[in-house]
Regions:
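Conserved phosphate-binding and hydrolysis motifs of nucleotide-dependent enzymes
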Residues: 7, 112-115
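Conserved beta-strand-loop-alpha-helix junction that forms the acyl-donor binding cleft
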Residues: 4-8, 102
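Vicinal oxygen chelate
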Residues: 22-77, 82-111, 121-124
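Alpha-helical macromolecular-interaction surfaces
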Residues: 9-10, 83
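Conserved active-site tyrosine of GNAT-family acetyltransferases
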Residues: 11-16, 88, 115
Length: 124
């Protein structure tokens, strides 16, 4: 999954230091950098990409820039969303208080420094 960001260095710092993600890939690529991060123990990675002509075809750059600061549609599962909320809040992460959903579980919203939004959910 690709998450478009304005500054890869800032994004890597946030995802690794604040969210505790592992840096899976960080290498030069096409004049830029290819960076992938993942929650600890996960096989699924997020590619943190600056939307510029180095990594994308020129005709896709503007649309990708418009994706920065929007909902990613990505959900992460937590066994203990309330403890996760407290831990992330202490680290200065922009996170909403977990709210119980109609289906019985809880959900929080997290924003990265660019305003890209993710959901954290837990089972009822």
């Amino acid at each position: 999954m690709i998450v478009f960001v304005s500054d890869q260095g800032q994004a890597v710092k946030f995802y690794s230091e604040k969210l505790g993600f592992d840096i899976m890939v960080n290498m030069p690529f096409k004049g830029g950098k290819w960076i992938e991060v993942a929650p600890q123990g996960s096989d699924t990675t997020l590619s943190l990409m600056v939307p510029d002509g180095k990594m994308l075809p020129p005709e896709d750059v503007e649309a990708a820039k418009n994706d920065i600061g929007t909902s990613t549609g990505i959900w992460f599962y937590s066994d203990d969303i309330h403890s996760e909320f407290e831990e992330l809040k202490k680290k200065g992460v922009d996170i909403t208080v977990p709210k119980q959903q109609d289906w019985g579980g809880f959900m929080s919203q997290v924003k990265d420094p660019d305003g890209n939004t993710f959901s954290i959910i837990s089972s009822p």
